[in-house]
Amino acid sequence: ESLFKMSPLISVYITNYNYARFLKKAIDSVLSQSFHDYELLIIDDGSTDDSKKIIGSYGSNPKVKIIYQHNKGLNVTNNIAIRAAVGKYIIRLDADDYFAANALEQMSGKLEANPELGMVFPNYYYIDEKDQVIGEEIRHDFDNNEVSLLDQPAHGACTMIRTDFLNKIGGYDESFNCQDGYELWIKFTQGYKVTNLKEPLFYYRKHGSNLTSNEEMILQTRAKINQKYINKLQTNNSTLAIIPIRGGDKDLAFQTINGVNILTAKINMLLRSTYVEKIIISSPDSRIEKYITPYKTKKNVLFHFRNETEARINDNLNATIFDISNKFGNNVANLAIITLEYPLIRREHIDDAINTMALFGTDSIVSVRPDNAIFYQHHGDGLHPILNRDKFTKLEREALFKQLGGITAVRKVVFDESKQTLSGRVGHVVIDQKAALGLFSNIDFEIISDITKKNQSSNKTNDVIEQ
């Protein structure tokens, strides 16, 4: 027998912070794997519950290494694990989740068979606090070329990665404290091949205290990650913003919320965008032109007279946008159509839409919210669910994406050729629930007015309609 023990093939690490109630299940799911060539690092991030006692009981197991540390947060801990790991492959298991018995065997087998492959991730089950399966996450098949747009990241945990590739890209970015999987995905997919397994190989726990429930923080962090990588790529994101206005006495352009005019607020918000170089207000209503007179000193806010025949309710905007693109679109890379109906959209949403389009190389992009509802059509004999969505539980149904937020952007060269705003490969940017609130009725006005009043009084400038 050799005096030198070979390094294990896989380094599994469990990160734990105050998850004593789930921790044993997670650790045991590693120790009972069908594949045995692994080491297990258990990293406790300064827990104050019974975690240390539970972890200590595994101290005599030769496969287990234990690291206790003061609270450092997830991304710092991920990098500590990478430095401590000796395996050819590395995989994280969160302390509130657990593996299927063949998880390590399946994922390492895929990587062993494909030396150029850098990352593999499986489908997974959703479970509740009592280990009841409440749904399944099913991904499109990377191996069968179902995936050509890499804008849906792998889960941050239970994804197996080739350790030397992970080191080459510098590990995890410690300036972010959540969305580690997304940040890594952006970096990793730029240089290495990734694939998935169609089998569910871990159990992901949905409960009130886990991070994924804080949607607004997640979306803001994703936007910051996108911005960071776009800054590195130095792409030309110059954008011409178009606000289409039909006009008429009841038009939103003439209305106010808490004393702030809706059109003025929208223009001022766009003027603060990193990428918007010109703002074109397009309307058949000549009063709108007078209304924007205060901006005349700014060379970048201009009026475009829109033919009345192109401003009817059922007419699409393509002819108008083509005219604007020809007249005002010199030297810009993108066209963005921004509607007035969504007053809680902020400049960060606009910038993130442009960044997302550039980062994933799509031709156009639209702002959306995922929607898991069941929709019906009337077929003359009663209601029928669309896409057989009644056959699935809520968590199994693949989300439909609902266009909300009033942001559509397209690369100018793509639009000039196709004369369609949503053209070529269409990307999406998810906006938060507040930003998706639109003005379509008196009740909407009341709700948005209340939100902005509350935010003005608590001085939360993020959701005040920008003046």
Task: Identify what each model region corresponds to.
Residues 1-29, 231-251:
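N-proximal low-complexity "stem/linker" segments adjacent to membrane-targeting elements
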Residues 18-32, 252-272:
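Short, well-formed alpha-helical segments that are part of the catalytic scaffolds
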Residues 27-68, 276-303:
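Acidic donor-binding segment of Leloir-type glycosyltransferases
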Residues 69-85, 314-324:
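Glycine-rich, basic loop-to-helix element that forms the pyrophosphate-binding segment
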Residues 90, 335:
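Short aromatic/hydrophobic "clamp" motif used to bind/position activated sugar donors
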Residues 104-134, 330, 356-365:
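Conserved donor NDP-sugar-binding/catalytic core segment of glycosyltransferases
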Residues 143-225:
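Conserved nucleotide-sugar donor-binding catalytic segment
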Residues 319, 323, 334, 343-432:
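Conserved core of the sugar-phosphate nucleotidyltransferase
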